């Protein structure tokens, strides 16, 4: 991983015309630059305020897929302007099939659909140099934030890593940190940015809207939001190259507490010795690290005896 950073530091001294890229992330000579993982959610995308933008049944979904795709492309363009090389994108919202993959350059790979052992961070490993989170949102215990939730608004009311309440930004940053990869940038609303900085420190954040409530915000236009993301991604990669951002590390072994909306999941999970039922709605389990913690969380959230095919 650090070898790529050393090479990228050399590349950043080469004129941009020699290592340039396009907004579509088209093939270039930048593959020796820092390797970047982009996890893309949807709730934090510019203009998103309700479910009408977030899934195939929403009347605005088709249009907002364009905006989500545009924000990821803007992040790629900014990262490449700073010397980034290989990029892997994780389509991490809903059905995992939101991004318009024909808009991306041939040198960008995209993780799609489910299930995935590492969920929103599938494919990350210690070969990556930095991670960028696009379209993220605040956590379920935050009274502020557009569409604030953690993992599942339908089934979960809290997830805790050791002794603190987590959200998707923090959880996924901890997964990245498990492999020594720092999160260098998060985009979303102002509540998301505040949560990220409170736990991850002085990372780059791109605020594209300001929350009034769960379903209301003052928002930038898509073009303006993409411009902010492009500029922030470029700055984030330059700071990565300068060694200014460290991985987010959690104490291991890690204790995970999962709180459900209803009582029966905790009751049934407690039949297994690895889960301790701590009250009517919550279970706790221990894991060696965040990779194991995530695999276990994926299981307890998704397993059903009637899963098909």
Each language-model region and where it sits:
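Active-site glycine-rich loop that binds ribose-phosphate moieties when present
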Residues: 153-179, 188-191
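C-terminal accessory domains and tails appended to enzymatic cores
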Residues: 225-309
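Bacterial N-terminal signal peptides that target proteins for export
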Residues: 1-9
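A glycine-rich helix N-cap at a beta->alpha junction
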Residues: 106-124
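Short catalytic helix/loop segments, enriched in acidic residues and glycine
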Residues: 54-74
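Bacterial N-terminal signal peptides
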Residues: 8-19
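Mature N-terminal segment immediately following signal peptide/propeptide cleavage
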Residues: 31-51
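Active-site rim beta-loop-alpha module in soluble metabolic enzymes
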Residues: 175-183, 187-237
């Amino acid at each position: 991983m650090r070898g790529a950073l050393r090479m990228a530091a050399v590349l950043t001294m080469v004129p941009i015309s020699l290592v340039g890229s396009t907004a579509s992330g088209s093939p270039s000579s930048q593959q020796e630059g820092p390797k970047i993982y982009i996890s893309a959610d949807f709730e934090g995308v510019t203009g998103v305020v309700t479910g009408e933008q977030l899934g195939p049944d929403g009347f605005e979904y088709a249009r907002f897929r364009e905006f989500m795709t545009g924000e990821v492309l803007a992040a790629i363009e900014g990262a490449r302007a700073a010397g980034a090389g290989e990029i892997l994108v994780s389509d991490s919202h809903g059905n995992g099939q939101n991004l318009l993959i024909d808009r991306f350059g041939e040198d960008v790979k995209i993780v799609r659909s489910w299930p995935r052992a590492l969920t929103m961070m599938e494919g990350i490993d210690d070969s990556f140099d930095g991670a960028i989170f696009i379209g993220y949102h605040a956590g379920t215990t935050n009274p502020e934030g557009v569409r604030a939730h953690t993992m599942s608004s339908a089934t979960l009311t809290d997830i805790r890593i050791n002794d603190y309440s987590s959200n998707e930004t923090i959880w996924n940053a901890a997964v990245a940190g498990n492999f020594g990869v720092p999160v260098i940038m998060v985009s979303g609303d102002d509540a998301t940015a505040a949560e990220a900085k409170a736990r991850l420190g002085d990372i780059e954040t791109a605020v594209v809207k300001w929350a009034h409530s769960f379903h209301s915000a003052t928002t930038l236009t898509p073009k303006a939001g993409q411009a902010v993301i492009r500029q922030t991604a470029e700055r984030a990669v330059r700071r990565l190259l300068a060694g200014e951002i460290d991985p987010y590390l959690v104490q291991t072994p890690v204790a995970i507490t999962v709180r459900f909306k209803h009582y029966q999941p905790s009751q049934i999970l407690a039949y297994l010795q690895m889960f301790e039922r701590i009250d009517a709605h919550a279970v706790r389990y221990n894991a060696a690290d965040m990779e194991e913690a995530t695999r276990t969380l994926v299981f307890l959230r998704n397993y059903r005896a009637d899963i098909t095919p």
